[in-house]
From Swiss-Prot:
Residues annotated for [4Fe-4S] cluster 2 binding in this entry: C147, C151, C154
Catalytic reaction annotation: L-aspartate(89)-[ribosomal protein uS12]-hydrogen + (sulfur carrier)-SH + AH2 + 2 S-adenosyl-L-methionine = 3-methylsulfanyl-L-aspartate(89)-[ribosomal protein uS12]-hydrogen + (sulfur carrier)-H + 5'-deoxyadenosine + L-methionine + A + S-adenosyl-L-homocysteine + 2 H(+)
Required cofactor(s): [4Fe-4S] cluster
Domain spans labelled Radical SAM core: 133-370
Residues in TRAM domain copies: 373-443
Pfam families referenced in this protein's UniProt entry, alphabetically: Radical_SAM, TRAM_2, UPF0004
Gene coding for it: rimO
Record's keyword annotation contains rRNA-binding: no
SUPFAM superfamilies recorded: Radical SAM enzymes (SSF102114)
Record-level GO BP terms: tRNA modification
InterPro entries: Elp3/MiaA/NifB-like_rSAM (IPR006638), Methylthiotransferase (IPR005839), Methylthiotransferase_CS (IPR020612), Methylthiotransferase_N (IPR013848), Methylthiotransferase_N_sf (IPR038135), NA-bd_OB-fold (IPR012340), Ribosomal_uS12_MeSTrfase_RimO (IPR005840), rSAM (IPR007197)
Name under which the protein is recorded: Ribosomal protein uS12 methylthiotransferase RimO
Organism field: Acinetobacter baumannii (strain AB0057)
Binding locations of [4Fe-4S] cluster 1: C13, C49, C78
Classification lineage: Bacteria, Pseudomonadati, Pseudomonadota, Gammaproteobacteria, Moraxellales
Cellular compartment(s): Cytoplasm
Length: 447
């Protein structure tokens, strides 16, 4: 009997990527092979995104392609919450499940393509860190599912539910397994990382025989003992974040904080139902930088939110200049089906949204360029992601750069035979542009 094969398409954010990794790991554990193309697959799983309309369309297109090329498709992920929308376009999909519905996906796979008999997962070994879709040297670590906030532009709680934190012992054991597998950078992700453990009332758990609370600070402190890069994403500026800044100042975790501020106008923040006030946030940033001078702050913002006036937008620009954030992403507001913001009055015309986006990015580009110029002459440790095909250049990142969303450090004039992805290098920064740094190699620190 031939081994059944399952094709897999993964769309969406890093949190969805982790969901895909878990499903793939379970498929492998149950004896399935992962097909490299549609033709060789007995069925195809499509993990969808449904956050904004463009992502919904991309997901529907991916389902359509899988149906056309294979014809036996199981749909999961955030868009799976809206089964009617999926079946309206693709009525013959085998099964539709929601986000993080690992067991439902596996039951559907077993139903339509039974697992091979006499499979022994202890003989057909699955790596202890599971199947990963990222390069070997970094990995995403999802610590919770869902969110307790009800931001008016977001439908995540309707797709993924309220906050459910993983037991801290499980989180830390996964992190330790990743380190044993050679991972040198862990990116901590969730919908609201700093709320970790709130739903469990900070329940006591155990790791390596020691008691650890299911709590943001305690988890970060334990992760800091692993001796690898730990990067925090999707953090709200709650008061208890201050204590984690101390860990960064001590070198326990990377001095990098990803906080989606979204706006700075108090009026717009209120319309968004965001749990932060811009003046308090500026004070927080000042305090954090006093504690940890090399702290890098990344954030994302939405311009053209319904009701945003020119005055609101100018408040945002002024705040941006004062905050001097290191890394920034910006999006024009896009209506999301099911978001309560759609019902707000005074929607901003598309041409004004675009004009504000361009003005915003121009201001931030100047801030970013000035900050990177100050790096010239500094010695930094960087992690190599890849090597250029045609040039003697290593594409790397420093502590200030998360993969895929931030800039790179291009280490020039290297001997490519001595360096490979996952190596840690010590470099001197020689030049900079608006988003990237250029460097020369001092030495290879670790391989």
């Amino acid at each position: 009997m031939k081994t059944p094969k399952v094709g897999f398409v993964s769309l969406g954010c890093p949190k969805a990527l982790v969901d895909s990794e878990r499903i793939l790991t379970q498929l492998k554990t149950d004896g399935y092979q992962v097909a490299s193309d549609y033709d060789g697959a007995d069925l195809v799983v499509v993990n969808t995104c449904g956050f904004i309309e463009s992502a919904v369309q991309e997901s529907l297109d991916a389902i359509g392609e899988a149906m056309s090329e294979n014809g036996r498709v199981i749909v999961t992920g955030c868009l799976g919450k809206d089964e009617d929308k999926i079946r309206q376009m693709h009525p013959n999909v085998l099964k539709v499940t929601g986000a993080a519905a690992y067991q439902d996906v596996m039951e559907a796979v077993h139903e339509y393509v039974p697992a091979p008999p006499k499979h022994n997962p202890f003989i057909d070994l699955v790596p202890e860190q599971g199947i990963r879709l990222t390069p070997k040297h970094y990995a995403y670590l999802k610590i919770s599912e869902g969110c307790n906030h009800r931001c008016t532009f977001c439908i995540i709680p309707s797709m993924r539910g309220d906050l459910v934190s993983r037991p801290v012992g499980s989180v830390l054991e996964e992190a330790a397994a990743l380190k044993r597998a050679g991972v040198k950078e862990i990116l901590v992700i969730s919908q609201d990382t700093s709320a970790y453990g709130v739903d469990t009332k900070y329940k006591l758990d155990f790791w390596n025989g020691q008691p650890v609370k299911t709590k943001f600070f305690d988890m970060c402190e334990a992760l800091g003992q692993l001796g690898i890069w730990v990067r925090l994403h999707y953090v709200y500026p709650y008061p208890h974040v201050d204590a984690v800044i101390d860990l960064m100042a001590q070198g326990k975790i990377l001095p990098y904080l990803d906080i989606p501020f979204q706006h700075a106008s108090p009026r717009v923040l209120k319309l968004m139902k965001r749990p932060a006030h811009s003046e308090n946030t500026l004070e927080k940033i000042k305090l954090w930088r006093e504690k940890c001078p090399n702290l890098v702050i990344r954030s994302t913002f939405v311009v053209g939110f319904p009701g945003e006036t020119e005055e609101d937008f100018q408040i945002l620009l002024d705040w941006l200049v004062e905050a001097q954030l290191d890394r920034v992403g910006c999006f024009t507001y896009s209506p999301v089906e099911g978001a309560t913001a759609n019902d707000l009055p005074d929607h901003v015309p598309e041409e004004i949204k675009q004009e504000r986006y361009e003005r915003f990015m121009q201001v931030q580009q100047q801030i970013s360029a000035a900050k990177l110029q100050k790096r010239i002459g500094q010695t930094m440790t960087v992690l190599v992601d890849s090597l250029e095909d045609e040039y003697p250049v290593a594409v790397a990142r420093s502590y200030a750069d998360a993969p895929e969303i931030d800039g790179n450090v291009f280490v020039e004039d290297i001997d490519k035979s001595t360096i490979q992805p996952g190596d840690m290098l010590e470099v001197e920064i020689t030049d900079a542009d608006e988003y990237d740094l250029f460097a020369k190699l001092i030495k290879i620190k670790s391989v």
